[in-house]
Amino acid sequence: MEKLSANKIRQLWIDFFRERNHFFIESKPLVPQNDDSLLWINSGVATLKDYFTGKKIPPSKRLVNSQKALRTNDIENVGLTSRHHTLFEMLGNFSIGDYFKTEAIDYAYEFLTKKLKLDPKNLFITYYDGDDITFEKWKSLGFSNEKLIKGSRKTNFWDLGQGPCGPCSEIYFDRGPKFDSRGSELIKNEIENDRFIEIWNIVFSEFNNDGQQNYTPLKSKNIDTGAGFERIVSILQDGPTNYDTDLFLPIIAEIEKNTVFRYKIENYFLKEPRQTQINKSFRIIADHIRAITLAINDGVQPSNLHRGYIIRRLIRRAYWNGKELGISHPFLYKLVEIVGKTLDYRFDIPTISKIILNEEENFAKTLEIGYNLLESQLKINKNQIKPVTVFKLFETYGFPVELTKEILAEKNIDFDLSQLVEFQEKHSQISRAKKTTGMQKVINSLTQIKAKISDFIGYHTHHIETKISFLANKDEEVAETNGENLSYVIFEKTPFYATAGGQKHDQGWIIQNNSTIEILDVFKDKFLNNIHVFKGKIVKNQPVFLKLDTKNRLNLERNHSGTHLLFASLRQEFGSEIKQLGSDNNEDRLTFDFPLNRKPSDQEIKSVENRINSYINQKIKRKYLVTNLEEAQKLNAIMTLEESEYMDPNSLRLVIFDKITTDLCGGTHIENTELLEKFTILSCQSKGSGIYRIRAVTSWNKYFEFLKGKIQEILSKISALKNKIKKIEPNFGLNLPNLVDLEQQFDYLKKIEDDLRIYYKKLLKSQLRIAKSELDANKIIEIGKFSFYLDFNLPLHNLKQIAATWREQNPRISFILGANLVNNEFLIIVSSAILASNQILEKIFEIFTGSGGGNYKIAQGKIQKKPEKEVFIKLLWENITEF
């Protein structure tokens, strides 16, 4: 057995199967594309499902991959056991209707014994009882009955309850009695152990389950294999665990630079309790930073929702384990570069590091206060924890519920998780189900269509006489429509583009027997037929004339091509790793979603816009190229658009704007960039979770419409600013000239707005100077280890700004300020840098009837009357541990 590097082992796998005519599929992103059934790519075959179901045509009947995958369902075992990981790689070789059992077993045996030079004496095989072909094949390779372990339906038959299924055969490697004195009964009895390591599983998909447990042979038999990359590496590098390899040890060495503690491989056998805990923390950090790095690289931003919540949870769990190693400063971001060296993937190291550093800094700000709260509550409640405290730790201090549970488990303390169900649903539940739209129901109901019966000719043809292939009222095929309901038609040939790839469907008309009927919608069925929606009378057995609305098509093409140019410009501005998360192009405007770890500046957005307008001025011709997947990859074609999922890999359509971008796309596009006229970014807004959406238009008409709207917005802002200034300077006046040119008017009014805003801020600052010098030391009250400043006799005007200013100047003091309102009501403002202002306000409302809200730093509300200072002090003493 030769000791090989992880990268060498991966390459040996790929090369071995390429030499045997397998097409290599590169590892896909961890975020599933067009598959709402999965949160993450969690297996090697997950990205290939459409090939096995027939939804997409595979580039070859033989495939090989090395797919990164992510699972967090058993995260509590990560670092504790030898082989549990959040991020892992699966090596896979697949046959779709090509070779079957004999060849699959031959390939596995040859790779393990010839390429990796594993001793066959150390291999044990499981097989399904009754699968004689598999049993005899392994026996012919020299395996004795003692090495061939008979499995049951439970252990050696893959069946999801409906659809393709079949027996499987697993390959185990025996690491010897030093790992466990017991023998092969560990495999037979499914006992968890570190001696017999499952390294390969071959699934023979040869039956179809109709859902009623009736099994029939498949016409096309398939092979689906999975080999555990980290497990194979640990065996070849003789590491006691997966962590003791060149996939993890360089990361662990980098962690050691930040702590006095050391990771000790030999402790696997020594099992010294304190060192076991130390090793566990090192492993958790090393494991999690790999998952964090790859997930962020694939476009996931840490947040409190969906996938972002899981990544934030991993960051905070890793950071907490750093604290267990005595690391009291951000350090995870420093590990990104070494992760890049241990894995064979391209990373945007600076961007990923910044995102992680920001997360660490945010968590560090509240970690100590939150942990102190937890400790104090445990002391007060005699090692019992209230669900409300767990809730507060998450909402206020950013402790994931699961992390709190782990911390408590280490202290042998349990808490009632059932009372947190509503909270967890609100903050971290991930919905995987989407409502089926009415249109999808129509598609599903058109069961009469069994194949592709229509051709799209609309790239170059805008009108045609053709025949009807299919005609239906609702979900019932008819010879003639009644004209009363929405109806559906498929033509032999059609110039009408169906909604796909972010581009809206074409508009136009059906003409038959001097009757003109408007096209209302066009969508695709599962066979990629364009289904046209209309309302009117049509006869199936008579020809029809189809006429495209060319003006509408031009606007669609402008916005679709504009999307491609926008994507190219964004890559120029923010780096080649920028991702497209979604786009929507109709005749009026385009939208484009992309992830970024910060809000793009106005200057950056303007730079993106100017670059696109330079593309327009260059008058670059659009080209189309139809090629195969391999050639498209050589051209560095961008292959992230949705339409690529439905293309034949041997007939891919590329849209090319020379020296700008080459994209895989099935949509329609302008012939020359000059047809875009004028590219204008209307807005760039956050959608949350680090995702931004750009809205833009691509013609002069739409640009002028936009300008008129912006001018009205600016005039409203100028009016509001003028009114605010007049409250401070009653004699202030402003006259605006009437300019005809829209661009001149916009520029002039924008400058007026900016000048007024600056002037208003100057007026406010002059008022706040007084506030900055008036902090009265006699009004500071010490409650426990916290300081409060109480003043209920302040002027109403600018009270919120005064509260914010005092908080910034005195971050260790929490401010509770008040001022009289009309009708004897009283304004309360809470402002604090160290306690939850909004929760202090909630406690005030429990004593004094009122309403309001806010956030951690500042909150305000109204109560019925001016409170007594002594009541406030009593309230603070009684509730200080809750804030």
UniProtKB/Swiss-Prot annotation:
Keywords: Aminoacyl-tRNA synthetase, ATP-binding, Cytoplasm, Ligase, Metal-binding, Nucleotide-binding, Protein biosynthesis, RNA-binding, tRNA-binding, Zinc
SMART domains: tRNA_SAD
One example GO MF annotation: tRNA binding
Catalytic activity, reaction form: tRNA(Ala) + L-alanine + ATP = L-alanyl-tRNA(Ala) + AMP + diphosphate
GO process terms (BP): alanyl-tRNA aminoacylation
Keyword ATP-binding included in the entry's annotation: yes
Localisation per UniProt entry: Cytoplasm
UniProt cross-references to InterPro entries, sorted A to Z: aa-tRNA-synth_II/BPL/LPL, Ala-tRNA-lgiase_IIc, Ala-tRNA-ligase_IIc_anticod-bd, Ala-tRNA-synth_IIc_core, Ala-tRNA-synth_IIc_N, Ala-tRNA_ligase, Ala_tRNA_ligase_euk/bac, Thr/Ala-tRNA-synth_IIc_edit
Cofactor: Zn(2+)
Broadest EC class assigned to this enzyme: ligase
Cofactor binding note from Swiss-Prot or TrEMBL: Binds 1 zinc ion per subunit.
GO cellular component, one term: cytosol
EC number: 6.1.1.7
Annotated S-S bridges: none
PROSITE patterns: AA_TRNA_LIGASE_II_ALA
Binding site for Zn(2+): H560, H564, C665, H669
Family: Belongs to the class-II aminoacyl-tRNA synthetase family.
Biological role stated in the UniProt entry: Catalyzes the attachment of alanine to tRNA(Ala) in a two-step reaction: alanine is first activated by ATP to form Ala-AMP and then transferred to the acceptor end of tRNA(Ala). Also edits incorrectly charged Ser-tRNA(Ala) and Gly-tRNA(Ala) via its editing domain.
UniProt comment concerning the protein's domains: Consists of three domains; the N-terminal catalytic domain, the editing domain and the C-terminal C-Ala domain. The editing domain removes incorrectly charged amino acids, while the C-Ala domain, along with tRNA(Ala), serves as a bridge to cooperatively bring together the editing and aminoacylation centers thus stimulating deacylation of misacylated tRNAs.
Protein name: Alanine--tRNA ligase
Lineage: Bacteria, Bacillati, Mycoplasmatota, Mycoplasmoidales, Metamycoplasmataceae
